[in-house]
Every structure is written in structure tokens, then in C-alpha cells.
């Protein structure tokens, strides 16, 4: 259930595997996804949200949690993990930590390491999680991290970086959370300008709408 699980410093949080097997009437024959033509990334977002739901089980009571920067990084998927969606689930786990306020305990170097070496999903989960943890605070450090993934926050003289559309959207949402209720004129104008941009002539920015 929500916020019912206490963390242990020597154990990682268990993320249950998604059940993607169904039953077909009338005899209840088992249906596996391996027998059906599906998109190669069909499990991507379900796995992300599975990580979020698992992370939201962690308690927020100080006396029942041992969450710190070491424990958060201890939960990183291991290289020998046989779950192909482990990294995506960990990304959702990071977002859940942020929603419950735990991501404020992640060290500065560890957070930058996630952004530099992590996948697109990791960047999305981390940016949204950090912004949710610091909602309405206009935190300078989090703003700098968002700026590394959002061209609109970078100075005109900055080197052009190969940023994915999804991480830029996450960073923009992060700006909205971080500056929520502050009435910061520059950030309001920036968000409105970004939201008003057309998708482009080839609609390359209209994929993966979730």
C-alpha cells in the first residue's frame, strides 16, 4: 500500500515484475506477448509507472525510513540483472522518491552522475522527482540541472547539445513545479513560449505523447 514499507539500509526495494500474461475465453488459454506483434518499446512506460508505484510504497515517516544518498544509489540495477526493464523501473523509482520528498537526500555528485551516465528514462524520472521534491522553492541547484536538459534555459552562447524531446518536456514540467506559485515573470514567459511552439513540419515532436 501507499507509504507502508520501511526501507532497510542493507536491502534494495523490491519492484514486482509486471504480469503481461492474459487469459483468452472461453477456455482460459494463456496468451503471451511473445505470440503477438507488438511495438518494441511497448513495455517502456508501463515499466516506468511500475517503478513509480513501487517507490510510492516507501514510508515518509522519519522513524521508519533509512533513505539517504547511499541507499538510493544502492538501488541502481546491477549489470547482471536479467530484467530488461530494470533501468526504466529504476527511473520510475527515482520519480517516486521525489514525489515523497526523499530525493532531496540524493547527493549533488550522484544526481549529476545520473544525468550524465543514465538513460533518457533516468533523466526524466530524476528531473521530475527533484522538481517535485523542491516544488515552489525556485531552488538554484535544481534549476541548473533542469537547464542542462532544456535549451530555453541555456545562454545563447552555450554549445548546442543533443537533447531528446522527452527530456526537454520533462525539464519544462520541472520548471513549472519548481516555480509553482512564485509568480516569477521570466519563468512564466519561458514556459508559455515553450508550450506555444508548433510541433514542427515533420511532426517529429508528436511521438510518444504520454
What would you call each of these model-derived segments?
Residues 1-210:
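Alpha-solenoid helical-repeat scaffolds
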Amino acid at each position: 500500500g501507499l507509504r507502508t514499507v520501511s526501507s532497510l539500509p542493507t536491502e534494495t526495494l523490491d519492484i514486482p515484475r509486471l504480469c503481461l500474461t492474459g487469459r483468452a475465453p472461453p477456455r482460459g488459454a494463456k496468451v503471451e506477448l511473445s505470440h503477438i506483434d507488438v511495438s518494441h518499446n511497448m513495455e517502456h512506460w508501463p515499466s516506468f509507472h511500475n517503478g513509480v508505484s513501487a517507490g510510492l510504497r516507501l514510508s515518509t515517516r522519519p522513524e521508519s525510513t533509512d533513505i539517504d544518498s547511499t541507499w538510493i544509489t544502492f538501488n541502481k540495477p546491477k549489470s547482471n540483472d536479467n530484467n530488461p526493464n530494470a533501468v526504466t523501473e529504476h527511473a520510475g523509482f527515482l520519480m517516486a522518491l521525489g514525489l515523497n520528498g526523499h530525493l532531496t537526500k540524493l547527493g549533488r555528485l550522484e544526481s549529476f552522475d545520473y544525468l550524465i551516465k543514465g538513460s533518457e528514462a533516468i533523466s526524466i524520472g530524476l528531473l521530475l522527482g527533484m522538481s517535485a521534491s523542491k516544488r515552489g522553492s525556485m531552488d538554484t541547484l535544481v534549476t541548473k540541472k533542469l537547464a542542462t536538459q532544456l535549451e530555453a534555459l541555456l545562454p545563447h552562447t552555450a554549445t548546442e547539445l543533443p537533447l531528446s524531446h522527452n527530456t526537454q518536456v520533462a525539464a519544462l514540467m520541472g520548471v513549472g513545479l519548481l516555480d509553482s506559485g512564485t509568480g516569477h515573470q521570466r519563468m512564466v514567459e519561458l514556459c508559455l513560449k515553450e508550450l506555444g511552439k508548433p510541433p514542427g513540419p515533420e511532426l517529429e515532436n508528436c511521438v510518444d505523447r504520454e
